[in-house]
Amino acid sequence: MKKIVLTGGGTAGHVTPNIALLPSLKEAGYEVFYIGSYTGIEKTLIEDLGIPYYGISSGKLRRYRSLKNLSDPFRVLHGLFQAKRLMKKIKPDIVFSKGGFVSVPVVLAAGSRHIPVIIHESDMTPGLANKIAMRKATKICCNFPETLKYLPEGKAVLTGSPIRQELLLGNKAAGLDLCNFTTDKPIILVVGGSTGAVHVNDAVRSILPELLKDFQVVHLCGKGKMDDSLNGTPGYVQFEYISEQMRDLFAISSIVISRAGANAICELLALKKPNLLIPLSANASRGDQILNANSFKEHGYSMVLTEEDMNKDTLLAAVRKLYADRHQYIINMEKSEQQDSIDKIMNLIKDNSK
């Protein structure tokens, strides 16, 4: 039986594509191991699935000045030694990395032992972690055609992003029961990402009285970001994070308000869910979500509202227009050619395993 190490973490977007590959990996006869951080969201998500999980030390790679820039390199170095020991212990035939800071020592450790590495880059332009790791990569998968020009020729492969197939199997009755909603009003799903989005959360809450006149709202706020004063509000329910029943929430939703992380928007595309994207601002990120959102807007898959332009009036108007035009967005998404990502990635894994 061949062995594969999966790595990636920090946010759910660096984990869910790995989870999406699990059924196909098991069907192909791979023994799966996961290397992540000690306390990241990946630990909870992977251990809940019964996959052998190994935590290592990791430090954030920053582009800005911070006192932690003095200590984090030592954490990365410690993580590298830990990852090397794990490579020696597990002896994987291949490593698949979804990125995030914890993946860097894992990829470097694999490269030092001449273990094939496949990296997946979901965003339009490579993040810092993948920029460092791609030097050791055998192949680099990407999500957008525009990304190919940023990747080494001969290594880059356009695959799209793997989507958890169970998301396509949502149960409307289960979703309505979870939220205690009815079928009397359409439902808006608000997704701030696994770590939450304070600006999006606050903006949605500011127009909640108006929204609830015409819609029901299910709000995924992020850990520690719920507003207890809103508990019990008719037509509104909030959760920190939902994993297994996410498919049921998608099933009941007419439209979705979301950040523009690459994996999140690819799930919306696969589900053909009309969506309003509010990308993380360039001031708070490297601007990758803005690029992702604009690409989907140009293809007619999404409406986009920037944080800078977002206020009560613009957000409410955007939601109403999105709902009014929802059928056209569905038609546009049905024409998309971004599919079969899992099959493409599995072929790369099989072809490049030792």
UniProtKB/Swiss-Prot annotation:
Compartment(s): Cell membrane
A GO term for molecular function: UDP-N-acetyl-D-glucosamine:N-acetylmuramoyl-L-alanyl-D-glutamyl-meso-2,6-diaminopimelyl-D-alanyl-D-alanine-diphosphoundecaprenol 4-beta-N-acetylglucosaminlytransferase activity
EC annotation from Swiss-Prot or TrEMBL: 2.4.1.227
Residues reported in the UniProt entry to bind UDP-N-acetyl-alpha-D-glucosamine: T11, A12, G13, R164, S194, Q289
Membrane topology: Peripheral membrane protein
Reactions catalysed: di-trans,octa-cis-undecaprenyl diphospho-N-acetyl-alpha-D-muramoyl-L-alanyl-D-glutamyl-meso-2,6-diaminopimeloyl-D-alanyl-D-alanine + UDP-N-acetyl-alpha-D-glucosamine = di-trans,octa-cis-undecaprenyl diphospho-[N-acetyl-alpha-D-glucosaminyl-(1->4)]-N-acetyl-alpha-D-muramoyl-L-alanyl-D-glutamyl-meso-2,6-diaminopimeloyl-D-alanyl-D-alanine + UDP + H(+)
One GO CC term, this protein: plasma membrane
Keywords: Cell cycle, Cell division, Cell membrane, Cell shape, Cell wall biogenesis/degradation, Glycosyltransferase, Membrane, Peptidoglycan synthesis, Transferase
Gene3D superfamilies in the record: Glycogen Phosphorylase B
One Pfam family cited in the UniProt record for this chain: Glyco_tran_28_C
Listed pathway(s): Cell wall biogenesis; peptidoglycan biosynthesis
Entry keyword annotation includes Lipid metabolism: no
UniProt keyword annotation of Flavoprotein present: no
One annotated GO biological process: cell division
Similarity comment text for this entry: Belongs to the glycosyltransferase 28 family. MurG subfamily.
General function of this protein: Cell wall formation. Catalyzes the transfer of a GlcNAc subunit on undecaprenyl-pyrophosphoryl-MurNAc-pentapeptide (lipid intermediate I) to form undecaprenyl-pyrophosphoryl-MurNAc-(pentapeptide)GlcNAc (lipid intermediate II).
Protein's recorded name: UDP-N-acetylglucosamine--N-acetylmuramyl-(pentapeptide) pyrophosphoryl-undecaprenol N-acetylglucosamine transferase
Species, as recorded: Lachnospira eligens (strain ATCC 27750 / DSM 3376 / VPI C15-48 / C15-B4)
Lineage, uppermost ranks: Bacteria, Bacillati, Bacillota, Clostridia, Lachnospirales
Gene transcribed to yield this protein: murG
